[in-house]
Amino acid sequence: FGVSNFTQTYSDVTDNSFTITIDAGEGEPFANTWTCTGEGMLSPEFSQMPGGMEGMVSIDFIEAEGVTLPSEEMFQPGESWTTRYVAEAVIGDAASGELTMTQTIEMTNNDIGSEAVSVPAGDFDNAIRVDTTGVVTMAMGDTGMTTTIDMNYSSWYVEDVGLVRQEFASLFGTEGANNPSVTELLSYEDQ
């Protein structure tokens, strides 16, 4: 997928929600509003995709349930939680032909525990590692064709910082154990 940089900004923070705006430097910044409950935080869409997929697919998320990140009580080694999304996706464009599909993304997230991680933004001794396994089920328009794709990735979170590293070992059927897609925090500012 190559190397890309982006800026992520948090705003409109309340007890029940906050907005994350992602600016990749090209085009309009992308914003979504997360909800916060006693169970944890839920992103309205699956936004953990690695960079480089811009322009390939248009996705409209129509359902989100479960928890993206759990409450502090659940964010403990050995705990797990689920997240589920349903989306309508369009691949291609009107000129060359479009393929419409419904995607269901079902994920199980497992808190592996704390470990040290080094990224350009610094060295963190107590990053919480979360391993995610998931299945993307795609129903291809009116064709009746359905396919499933396994997805596996690990994320490292640091208290008072957030996500500092994410590594996709398997994405859309492409094994990446020898060359995973990696996102790392370059820098951050306390607000």
Regions found by a protein language model. Name each.
Residues 1-191:
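Conserved functional acidic sites
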